[in-house]
Amino acid sequence: MDNEAFTMGYFRLLAAKLSPHGYEPKQLVDAIWAGTAAMVKNDGTRSNEDAFWKKFAGVYGEKALADKPLFDEFYENDFQTAKAFCGVNPKAAETVHTLKEMGLRAALATNPIFPAVATESRIRWAGLEPEDFELRTTYENIGYCKPNPDYYREIAARLGVRPEECLMVGNDVTEDMIAQSIGMQVFLLTDCLINKERKDISLYPRGSFLQLLDHIETHQCHSKSAERQE
């Protein structure tokens, strides 16, 4: 997915929805970014939802809280048009289905800056269902964001596993590969690579969706071999 195209399209849709209700587009976008920054800085003491709305209401006052149903309505309806800004790679859904057929557990570790209704829509746009994932992080159900390592610690804790038992698969070098710092195994998808800081990607196992499956199958074989030796 082209993140820039999606973000621009998303803001256009949101401004079109809210400008008739007194939200000037530029100020609205600035306030959304400020709320997003508050979520990224969140330390787990509150939900990302609460962090966002506290900051957003700091710009618009109580009006913002009173207008929250407008935002809910936007995500239920207008936001669905944003699918046009998302490039869908069918290999993503195919890979998730294959992993589940292999008996592996799947969690959607997407940056939790959107409400559940938006996240679930994006899952369906990708050809999957929310129920395909044991856990889906949204701004309502977690108090951290990427690239905070505590975000990944929280996911492992909720799944009831040690970080070392997890494989974080992602395409963003900065936001996803940080999971390695808490002991998670990682795999960098290079089909749609994001590397804004131009980091050395040779440090990570990496490749396409097909190579990801090969990587997992190889790892499983090694694990089973080690178990037999024990």
Question: Which residues fall in each region the model found?
Answer:
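Short helix-capping segments at alpha-helix termini
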Residues: 19-25, 62, 127-132, 160
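A cross-family glycoside hydrolase active-site/sugar-binding cleft signature
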Residues: 109-111
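Short, acidic loop-to-helix structural element flanking the phosphoryl-transfer center
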Residues: 47-51, 65-69, 76-107
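Asp-based, Mg2+/Mn2+-dependent phosphohydrolase catalytic module
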Residues: 93, 97-98, 113-114, 119-230
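A metal-dependent, Asp-based hydrolase signature
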Residues: 26-76
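Short, solvent-exposed loop/turn segments at secondary-structure boundaries
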Residues: 2-5, 43, 200-201
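Hydrophobic alpha-helical core bundles mediating ligand binding, dimerization, or RNAP-core interactions
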Residues: 7-15, 32-36, 53, 71-82, ...
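Active-site neighborhood of HAD-like aspartate-dependent phosphohydrolases
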Residues: 1-31
